[in-house]
Regions:
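Catalytic-site microenvironment of enzymes
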Residues: 2-272
Length: 272
């Protein structure tokens, strides 16, 4: 009996020692994990701080966790023929803002179509978890292209979406395109790459949703609404109002929904 008690005591003693050792290892492991998490968190913080300094120093667009999208429904009910520089420090000028094109079959103003799509896009983006800032929500405004870009710049948005409709001398011209600045743009070359990527994502996804002819990304350095930008920007030419069929489609609510779905998918792809 004494031997049995002795063996039991020794067994309990060994078990206790093993348990204590396991607890020490567990504590050590947890401490190491906490140190690792703290290190990774600190490295991310340092990386973000460095990126912020770089962005401020070189005036680069900030994306990161930014979920703010600025939407500009191009044009307005009444144009403003007063002149403004096409870019910072430019001697060349353009009208501050025009009324835009008119549908060849519907007679509908481009500015109104742009606004209809913009309001739908706002709703869809907000439902998708984005913050949205609108340049205009009505036709009765007087906002120049430079002023529109300044609103986007001041917001430091992740993307500036400028909605337009196209027009051409030939009624056979059709399709969707986007516009971005070149890497040699004298006013906003720092956003050229990001703007191209945004433009490519948007036009590809719109055409995938609508079946419209994909005219790709047009590079243009003469657009005031682009040249004044410091944030990634794209002008979306949704279709041709000079084309009888596309003009009707651009006023069709279900077709507008397809355009909106394409833009949202494009923004999602760009933000990944």
């Amino acid at each position: 009996m004494k031997k049995l008690i002795k063996l039991l005591f020794i067994s309990l003693l060994i078990t206790g020692c093993v348990y204590q050792e396991q607890q020490k290892k567990l504590i050590k492991t947890n401490v190491l994990k906490q140190q690792e998490v703290a290190y990774i968190s600190n490295q991310r913080k340092i990386k973000n701080e460095i990126q912020t300094v770089i962005n401020q120093e070189y005036d680069l667009p900030v994306i990161g966790n930014n979920r703010l999208i600025v939407i500009d429904a191009g044009h307005q009910a009444h144009g403003n023929s007063e002149q403004e520089p096409i870019g910072p420090g430019a001697s060349e000028t353009k009208a501050k803002v025009t009324t835009g094109a008119t549908g060849v079959s519907t007679g509908k103003l481009e500015s109104l179509i742009n606004l209809e799509v913009a309001l739908k896009l706002q709703q869809k983006l907000e439902m998708s978890g984005y913050q949205v800032k609108m340049i205009r929500t009505s036709q009765d405004v007087n906002i120049s292209n430079r002023e529109r870009a300044m609103v986007a710049n001041d917001s430091n948005c992740a993307a500036f979406i400028r909605l337009h409709c196209n027009s051409a001398d030939s009624s056979s011209a059709s399709g969707t395109l986007t516009i971005a600045p070149s890497i040699n743009n004298p006013y906003c070359s720092q956003i050229a790459e990001a703007s191209y990527n945004l433009s490519k994502c948007v036009v590809d996804n719109i055409c995938s949703q609508t079946g419209s002819k994909n005219r790709g990304v047009m590079i243009n350095d003469t657009m005031s609404g682009i040249n004044w930008c410091k944030v990634p920007v794209t002008i979306v030419e949704m279709g041709f109002l000079s084309n009888y069929e596309e003009d009707r489609l651009l006023s069709d609510s279900s077709y507008q929904d397809k355009i909106v779905n394409g833009i949202v998918k494009g923004i999602n792809e760009y933000m990944e």
